[in-house]
Amino acid sequence: MEFRHHVRKLAGLSMIGCSCAGLYSYQDEGMKRSVYFWRHAFPIYAHYRVYQLLMEKIALPVDKQKQIYERLHEKHASHVFDIVLSLKGFYIKLAQAGSTRADFLPSQYLTRAVKLQDEAPSKPVSEIKYIISQSLQTSWDNIFTSIDPKPLGAASIGQAHRAILKDSGEEVAVKVQHPDAEHFFRSDMKTIKAFCRYFQPAHLPYLEEVEKQFMTEFNYHEEALNLEMVRDNLKKSPFASRVAVPTPKIEFCTKEVLVMEYLRGKKLLVGIQEHLECIAKERGMSLEELRTKQQKMDEERLAMGLDITLGPTQFELKALAVKRWIRLRYLQLLNCMPGNLVSKPLEIDCDKELNKKLLNVPSILKLLMDVHGYEIFVDGCFNGDPHPGNILLLEDGRIGLIDYGQVKRISLEHRIKLAKLTVALAEGSREDIVHALTVEMGVRSAKMNSYFLEKQARLMFDRDDLTVTEGMNVQSFVEYLDS
């Protein structure tokens, strides 16, 4: 086992050498990116891997392992994100995917990853206007009165701006693809797949699917058609009055440019952040103290095999809202009393504070699960890349769903098979899960081991918390399954 491991390391190092030689031969930008990745990312991976193997070999207690991993995270997190921000593209996409996993990603990485959900590096508006003019084959100002220089958000392959249509005066969002985004993605995928082939082969099938699915994001005209289809489907759903999908302006959509209805609201994460700040303030705690307390409660519940809590109950939320309203109005009254009219010693804008809404987070999460479940099992047409950066809390109280670049379609036959597997995972035994996976869905493995099949089904279609991975981190558990 150790021999094979060292062979893999040598092969990886040899590949770096070959890449460096190739750089001088071809001077291709994609090759430069590959060399940069291997030169900067591989030593970080090796540092983690060596410590992992050493700790396993000497059977170091879990608490000691956590301390060592914390030091490694502190040392490497900033360097990892320097690599991400330097290479952009697919690496930002990976960071965005990681940002949704607070239960998995260490805090040193999570805080940086969350910022990349809609704050990825952006290009100046002058370049955006040039791309629009080239793609639409007319000057941008023939279509738009103005384009806001500040991006609404920037993602892995492009960015979005608010604009005003010249003919109608309507406010729209304009999504523009960065030049070379597709070329760099193809090159980066080769690099990542090569890395996994040598060091994390269990992840290769997942990467193959990611590559296939992500390629659909490079045609914004197709995304406009996806928006139309999903929007029409949801208008016929039980959630029509509670969710909104923007209407695309098909006549202005090309492979590189997508023009659509502008939805007024804030990012879901911004709303939840304000919600948590309000709760912390009412409980006399800092936001960090609230998070620490909640994390401890979650760990205790998971250790007992219980689901984590998603927030205050409906009754607790109403009681908290009333208490908060009374406190803020009382402070407002104090500020208006004689003697305080000029100096206003209480530095608080009560009206602004009251505009920060307390959210029924469990209700919002249930709605999102219901909507995406409806897309999958009823419509057979769903967003293959849902993450918090693509979800808005609209001013009218609805949930806004944006970014349908990755839309997956599945037949009724496959939906039925997937539904049977989902029910088995939720309610059935190992035998039920294996039956749904192998007999119904036709999945095969080398040894057809029932333990292996059940765990793979849970990792892919259910969850990957410690109750599933038996106390190991996901990477170690996947390697354990492969062995």
Where are these regions (language model features)?
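ATP-binding pocket architecture of kinase catalytic cores
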Residues: 149-152, 166, 170-177, 181-186, ...
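Conserved beta3 strand of the Hanks-type protein kinase catalytic N-lobe
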Residues: 163-166, 386
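Helix-rich C-lobe and terminal helical cap/extension of kinase-like folds
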Residues: 70, 74-75, 101, 251-254, ...
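Short pocket-lining segment of the protein kinase catalytic domain that shapes the ATP-binding cleft
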Residues: 120, 125, 129-133, 231, ...
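Catalytic-loop of the protein kinase fold
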Residues: 378-388
